[in-house]
Amino acid sequence: MTAPIQDLRDAIALLQQHDNQYLETDHPVDPNAELAGVYRHIGAGGTVKRPTRIGPAMMFNNIKGYPHSRILVGMHASRQRAALLLGCEASQLALEVGKAVKKPVAPVVVPASSAPCQEQIFLADDPDFDLRTLLPAPTNTPIDAGPFFCLGLALASDPDDASLTDVTIHRLCVQGRDELSMFLAAGRHIEVFRQKAEAAGKPLPITINMGLDPAIYIGACFEAPTTPFGYNELGVAGALRQRPVELVQGVSVPEKAIARAEIVIEGELLPGVRVREDQHTNSGHAMPEFPGYCGGANPSLPVIKVKAVTMRNNAILQTLVGPGEEHTTLAGLPTEASIWNAVEAAIPGFLQNVYAHTAGGGKFLGILQVKKRQPADEGRQGQAALLALASYSELKNIILVDEDVDIFDSDDILWAMTTRMQGDVSITTIPGIRGHQLDPSQTPEYSPSIRGNGISCKTIFDCTVPWALKSHFERAPFADVDPRPFAPEYFARLEKNQGSAK
């Protein structure tokens, strides 16, 4: 399971050893919409408007207006690449990440001399300091609210108990030379910390960490109830790497930073200060969100007052394309692991695999593969679906399939839905349940059953064969042969194109 990766540069070095996993360009690119527009055609995938595809991670070495900067996009934009980076089979990601969250390895603090993230230090009280010229924060579309840091891992602690630390990825829009707006959904742990500090009239120290070991980003995307209040998600990365994540004391705020991050923004969430997200553009939009739509600009967001920026020499700014495959990987793997652990604990051996499908951005749509071994297993598929919905509240739809269906092949899933489902008996709806705030369909205008914005109808599609009819639904039994001797050049090309990620 372990891989010799401590930071983003180690991850890049690993990808460079494999075909079709990493690409660099020296062609000049504008971070304002052009970069995302380019990567849409190379590797964004996901729910990005077609045409798009899944492709390699891409480094842009020549950023217009930023001669000493480079931007990486797409590090996590492939399930196979995630498996390569975590050192496991792509089909086993849910199981392996699920093991890690149950046995976290706590982070450790190292001295500044051992922290590459502080090789360069820029203090905000310097009269020449300007976040807008220091870092090339991209926009994804021409109608974004402004430049965003899309992979800024926020790290903050409970103001009443510094031993309670949380890390999560939040939407961060550059609002001035030393200000960022921060979108914090209700109930998020850092939002709880912020509210406590604000109630006391105090700022909340925070660091924004960018350019990280992929294991850190994946672990940070776990949510309650799998990682309850007080659970430090850096422990997941520690378990995945079998080595603790290293932290370092910030240079300007009393908070820790990821020691091997490429870039760290240090600052304070100010009490009682709010800003309109699109105050400089008046676009009405924020940025592309994972469902595939441009989210609305928030009229009132908390503000981070930047105190310092630290970075490595020749630092890499890491970003993603909002609704792309990268979001599916980052959000989806913790979703899958949470479902796996919950169902396996309640019905051991029944769930064979789980996939948080790209169409749902890793959050809305879960495909559960189950295996009925005896008559008593009939009905347990519904129990598994309910457990999944309970373990991950942001799920909207569950599709249940048998063990002979490839859950990573949408054609196979639709085949099961077409030939093994009858709408009048195979669909269970659960209306009136709180959904994810970014689902644009959960409004009273969309459905008369919805009493208020944010309420959704959860749906279970049972595409499994009833136990009593199993013998009538066996797939055509083709001969099991090795085709490679018949077309060696074709299979050599195929294996080369697939790389060594699987």
Which residue stretches match the model-derived regions?
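Extended, highly charged
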Residues: 1-303, 307-502
